[in-house]
From Swiss-Prot:
Organism: Anaplasma marginale (strain Florida)
Region forming the signal peptide: none
Record InterPro entries: Ribosomal_uS10, Ribosomal_uS10_dom, Ribosomal_uS10_dom_sf
The protein's assembly and partners: Part of the 30S ribosomal subunit.
Protein name: Small ribosomal subunit protein uS10
SUPFAM superfamilies associated with the record: Ribosomal protein S10
Coiled-coil ranges from the UniProt annotation: none
UniProt gene name: rpsJ
Recorded GO MF terms: structural constituent of ribosome; tRNA binding
Single biological process term from Gene Ontology: translation
Length: 105
């Protein structure tokens, strides 16, 4: 049985959805017997957009929008293929972007 280090990076606009997904991943990994480090909270990225309200005049009247991207990192230092298969079968919400990086093995 080959052990590997697995990094799971989660991104979402909704932090409640992101925290619930991280909790589910940690729960499944611990049930499988893996040691879990995290979730590590990364600084949120805020993208701001400012547009004119009218189509061609009145520059003083503007609308402001922002998108907040939240990130979490979960690492499994000694994971085997059974844990990886359990994580791959996990159903996560549509608003969560998942990147899995496997190192070693």
């Amino acid at each position: 049985m080959v052990t590997q280090k697995i990094y799971i990076e989660l991104k979402a606009f909704d932090h409640c959805l992101l925290d619930g997904s991280a909790r589910n991943i940690i729960l499944i990994a611990r049930r499988s017997g893996a040691k879990v480090n995290g979730p590590v909270f990364f600084p949120r990225r805020i993208a701001k957009f400012i547009v004119n309200r009218s189509t061609h005049v009145d520059k003083k009247s503007r609308e402001q929008f922002e998108i907040r991207t939240h990130k979490r990192l979960i690492s499994l230092p000694k994971a085997n293929s059974a844990i990886l298969q359990a994580l791959m079968s996990l159903q996560l919400p549509a608003g969560v972007d998942v990147k899995v990086k496997v190192v070693g093995g």
